[in-house]
Amino acid sequence: MTTFLAKNWSSLIKPTKVQYEAVDNNPNIKTMVVEPLERGLGLTLGNSLRRVLLSSLRGAAITSIKIPGVEHELSPVSGVKEDLTDIILNIRDVIVKMDSVQKCNLRLEVTGPAVVTAGMITVTDKQDVTILNPQHVICNLSKGFNLEMDLICEQGKGYVPTSCLHNSDSPIGAIHLDALFNPVRRVSYKVENSMVGQMTNYDKLIITVETNGVVNPDAALGLAARILLDQLQVFINFQEVEEEKPEKLELQTINPVLLKKVYELELSVRSQNCLKNENIVYVGDLVARTETQMLKTANFGRKSLNELKKVLANFNLEFGMKDIGWPPDNLESLAKKHEDQY
């Protein structure tokens, strides 16, 4: 692969920042702003991320329930005010978080009168499972009645109808539920203009993500981006060659402030002349000297010393510094490189 081909992507402007902003102080709803993007990429990325967010993220959902004496969705449940259809809809809205297991058994046992909530569900397998909306109402149970229910919770992705969930492992008499595994509830995006320098023909992608709390919105967006990256790898049918980066002449190992010329420090004329007479050219030359050595300099007194100490302190430097690698072997080339950069 040639450098010419690499310019197809390396020459494009890349986003420099992602801003995260909670909506209405709700941690489960965030707006994320990405800019700048090349013209047209805002729409391309926004649409792709939205589709992946709504279809491909994994989560957990209750996939079946079993109530003694109840054989199908139209059967009445003794002592419960709601129809079984309403109970099923309410159970589908129970938010379950389970990371370490693929499938677990849950149990609900309540004696009336009671408002049956999701927080009353217990985990029979003693697995690491959490109900995130414990106050969510499932049904209302009348006095003198008991409600027993076995539930199965599974991991999956996207939306799976009951016809695809039914299998031979299902207990006899189990009622299957349509499962919405995806932890992302809503995604919307818009594209606005972004300014780079004086140019406004770049895109700004503003994407808003709402989740059910199993995963936070910014993590969900990161997962969607990772899924896209993984899926697109198959189309890259060439070997990339890393560009050789010019050597930085040890600038990374030496404090660049040491390469400053002392005349850049805006010292008094007296101090400047003293340093010049002592052939002190760089800040590195200066901090390598001790205070005692400096006071032995002709016409250099305590006042000049205090002036220099104050200036050096602004750079977190001081007299008599050791182990600073000064002077470096290639001082002239490093100084030239420093001047070119600054």
Swiss-Prot record:
Asked if the record carries the keyword Transmembrane, the reply is no
Q: Which domain of life is it from?
A: Bacteria
Q: Which parts of this chain are annotated as the region Alpha C-terminal domain (alpha-CTD)?
A: 254-342
Q: Name one GO cellular component term.
A: cytoplasm
EC number(s) per entry: 2.7.7.6
Q: Which reaction does it catalyse?
A: RNA(n) + a ribonucleoside 5'-triphosphate = RNA(n+1) + diphosphate
The record ties this protein, via InterPro entries, to: DNA-dir_RNA_pol_insert (IPR011262), DNA-dir_RNA_pol_RpoA/D/Rpb3 (IPR011263), DNA-dir_RpoA (IPR011773), RBP11-like (IPR036603), RNAP_asu_C (IPR011260), RNApol_insert_sf (IPR036643)
Any idea which UniProt keywords this protein has? DNA-directed RNA polymerase, Nucleotidyltransferase, Transcription, Transferase
One example GO MF annotation: DNA binding
Q: Name one Pfam family in it.
A: RNA_pol_L
Which family is it part of?
Answer: Belongs to the RNA polymerase alpha chain family.
* Name of this protein: DNA-directed RNA polymerase subunit alpha
Q: Which organism is it from?
A: Orientia tsutsugamushi (strain Boryong) (Rickettsia tsutsugamushi)
